[in-house]
């Protein structure tokens, strides 16, 4: 990067957003109000649900959305943008509306996570960053939540910064992991920026720096008696590491009356070593000593450890969490669903594809979630046209939009709107929750899902249904487009 060049994140956009914006202005569309939905088509890892995340960083981006003179000069140098468009960018500010599901909300395919209502150029320029931040953080939050659930109440620490795909991925990934249930992160700057608790004790290098393993452990216990978690696999876990840890605990912590301490296993047969370690620690009287394990873990390996009767109190999970290694793409898209005509009427738009899963759901919409009043559990999600309301005092028949003969009557339920206002006329109206509040909300909302939806393999298919009015509009647009092309 040029040393005199400042980084303006507004320029983190796909070039076609600028060429389209230039074209919109030339065509007279710059003031035309458009509606875009951000949604995904399938849950990573074949899961039953995803976790929404990344909204806070999208807000940060919009709050600083502007084009510097160096940006205008660069674009002018490309030689394809008219001066009127460059003037437009030089005076750019966001003036639209945004709605979104709160971070930490369980979400499902084909329902809008973010809705943008704004003039055409403004809405188009948001596309790349909206997708970047929602895709990345939702991906990591979804993976982290799977791992946390596999841990069955034991602590999960995010350890992946060094394996993340770039610094931003490490920082924001740690945030997303914390929202989804991790107890903390090894990423110090994420704690500094977001308040995700920074955790960590020692690496093998600490042990290697001392003449003996015991000296390394004893010194660490002296310096950090309230946080003595010793890495015991540098040389020989059972014959050296654990015995030396026990000796250090006896010599340093016991005289201080400290009973809480820990060891960490980072290699070898984790299940076997954890069982042996637990036995050795208990026999030595250190029953409150915790056993933390790491080493390329994910939800499936953690499940396997439980099947092998592993004795584990906490997990440090790195590369397979921070990169979502098993399926590292979330797949959110940003699609035009409506425009306003010159009289302010909302005109629904649809994109058709040979791939049925890529056909969009048109119109400016509301998203409801139905909860059973007796159980508190989520029953289904329900998309309506923006001007519809749901009367949850009456029974309602819902149907699968892809198989309309599959119908169900919902009764004794509560309907809650999921999309909340974030921006109104360019002004931030959303009260941004703190990270602890988001984390708590995420836990509460995941608890509203039935266990069948939370299965790792072959989860129950949670339905996102359409109102009859919305379904009819979509069908009418499909038929209209098909008839037009058949005539040609």
PLM-predicted stretches and their roles:
Residues 2-33, 42-44, 80-81, 86-95, ...:
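Buried, small/hydrophobic-residue-enriched core segments of structured protein domains
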Residues 204, 294, 318:
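Residue-level "edge-of-site" marker
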Residues 60-64, 100-103, 107:
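An N-terminal, globular interaction/scaffold subdomain
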Residues 73-74, 142-146, 160, 454-461:
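Short coil/turn segments at secondary-structure boundaries
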Residues 34-90:
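N-terminal, Lys/Arg-enriched amphipathic/low-complexity engagement segments
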Residues 2-32, 36, 45-47, 282-284, ...:
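Gly/Ser/Thr/Ala-enriched C-terminal appendages of enzymes
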Residues 98-104, 413-418:
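Short acidic, Pro/Gly- and aromatic-enriched capping/linker segments at domain boundaries
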Residues 199, 263, 291, 313-315:
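Hydrophobic residues within beta-strands of alpha/beta enzymes
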């Amino acid at each position: 990067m040029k040393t005199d060049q400042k980084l303006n994140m507004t320029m983190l956009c796909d070039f076609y957003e600028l060429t389209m914006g230039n074209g919109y202005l030339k065509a007279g569309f710059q003031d035309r109000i458009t509606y875009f939905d951000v949604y995904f088509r399938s849950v990573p890892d074949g899961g039953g649900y995803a976790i929404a995340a990344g909204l806070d960083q999208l807000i940060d981006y919009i709050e600083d959305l502007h084009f510097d003179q160096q940006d205008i000069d660069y674009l002018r140098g490309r030689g394809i943008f008219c001066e009127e468009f460059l003037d437009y960018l030089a005076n750019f500010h966001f003036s639209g509306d945004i709605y979104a599901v709160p971070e930490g909300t369980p979400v499902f395919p084909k329902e809008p996570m973010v809705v943008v209502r704004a003039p055409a150029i403004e809405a188009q320029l948001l596309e790349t960053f909206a997708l970047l931040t929602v895709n990345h953080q939702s991906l990591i939050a979804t993976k982290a939540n799977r791992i946390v659930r596999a841990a069955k109440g034991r602590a999960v620490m995010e350890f992946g910064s060094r394996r993340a795909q770039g610094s931003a991925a490490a920082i924001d990934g740690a945030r997303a992991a914390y929202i989804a249930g991790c107890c903390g992160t090894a990423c110090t700057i994420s704690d500094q920026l977001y308040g995700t608790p920074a955790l960590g004790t020692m690496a093998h290098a600490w042990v290697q720096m001392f003449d003996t393993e015991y000296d390394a452990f004893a010194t660490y216990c002296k310096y950090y008696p309230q946080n003595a978690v010793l890495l015991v696999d540098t040389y020989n876990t059972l014959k050296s590491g654990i015995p030396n840890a026990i000796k250090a605990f006896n010599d340093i912590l016991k005289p201080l009356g400290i009973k809480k301490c820990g060891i960490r296993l980072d290699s070898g047969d984790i299940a076997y070593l954890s069982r042996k370690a637990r036995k050795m620690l208990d026999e030595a009287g250190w029953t409150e000593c915790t056993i933390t394990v790491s080493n390329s873990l994910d939800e499936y390996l953690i499940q396997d450890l439980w099947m092998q009767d592993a004795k584990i109190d906490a997990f440090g999970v790195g590369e397979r969490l921070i990169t979502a290694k098993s399926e590292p793409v979330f797949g959110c898209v940003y699609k035009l669903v409506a425009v306003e005509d010159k009289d302010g009427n909302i005109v629904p738009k649809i994109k058709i594809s040979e791939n049925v899963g890529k056909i969009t759901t048109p119109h400016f919409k509301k998203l409801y979630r139905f909860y059973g009043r007796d159980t508190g559990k989520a029953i289904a999600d329900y998309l309506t046209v923006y001007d519809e309301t749901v009367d949850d005092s009456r029974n309602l028949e819902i149907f699968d939009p892809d198989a309309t003969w599959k119908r169900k009557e919902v009764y004794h339920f509560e309907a809650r709107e999921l999309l909340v206002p974030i921006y109104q006329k360019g002004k931030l109206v959303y009260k941004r929750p703190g990270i602890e509040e988001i984390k708590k909300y995420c836990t509460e909302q995941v608890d509203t899902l039935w266990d069948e939806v939370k299965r790792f393999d072959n989860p129950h298919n949670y339905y996102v249904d359409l109102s009859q009015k919305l379904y009819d509009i979509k069908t009418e647009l499909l038929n209209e487009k098909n008839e037009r092309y058949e005539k040609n």
